[in-house]
Amino acid sequence: MGCCYSGETDTGKGDQGEREHLLPQSQSLPNKAPNESEQNSTNNPSARTDEQAMLSRILAKTAQNIIDVSAVESQGMEQHECMDRARQYSTRLAKLSSNLMDWKKVPPLPSLTSQPHQILASDPVPFADIQQVSKIAAYAFSALSQIRVDAKEDLVVQFGIP
């Protein structure tokens, strides 16, 4: 932003507007004691006008650098426009979320052991064991597929309620 006076010299680093002096170095405001403030303003009107001119320049420079964000967004947005936009956004969001349901997240693999490197480094499972497990799974599948329920009597019994 700026400073009134600094003893540091400009090294050329950073933003030039940051190092720029708001008050010229040749002019400095006189130091006033608390009791002298009223006397100086009445005795020296030219000093007061110089101060006013410097202050007005500082205010003008500051006003140029300020961006009022609240005024920018609120230009012309009425309530029905906000409601229309909200409806439009919600329909778009509903379309996107329905598309996301198709892409179900694949569950991660279960963690069967805390040391998978030992399992991967061990000997592979023998082929005979794999055949035995496959045969048992086939028998279990055929047994489950042959289960039938035969209805021998009615499941709902009518009571003699008139």
From Swiss-Prot:
Transmembrane segments: none annotated. Keywords: Endosome, Lipoprotein, Lysosome, Membrane, Myristate, Palmitate. A lipid is attached at residues 3-4 (S-palmitoyl cysteine). N-terminal myristoylation and palmitoylation mediates its recruitment to lysosome membranes, thereby promoting localization of the Ragulator complex to lysosomes. N-myristoylation by NMT1 is required for palmitoylation at Cys-3 and Cys-4. Key component of the Ragulator complex, a multiprotein complex involved in amino acid sensing and activation of mTORC1, a signaling complex promoting cell growth in response to growth factors, energy levels, and amino acids. Activated by amino acids through a mechanism involving the lysosomal V-ATPase, the Ragulator plays a dual role for the small GTPases Rag (RagA/RRAGA, RagB/RRAGB, RagC/RRAGC and/or RagD/RRAGD): it (1) acts as a guanine nucleotide exchange factor (GEF), activating the small GTPases Rag and (2) mediates recruitment of Rag GTPases to the lysosome membrane. PANTHER family: RAGULATOR COMPLEX PROTEIN LAMTOR1. This is Ragulator complex protein LAMTOR1. It comes from Xenopus tropicalis (Western clawed frog). The gene is lamtor1.
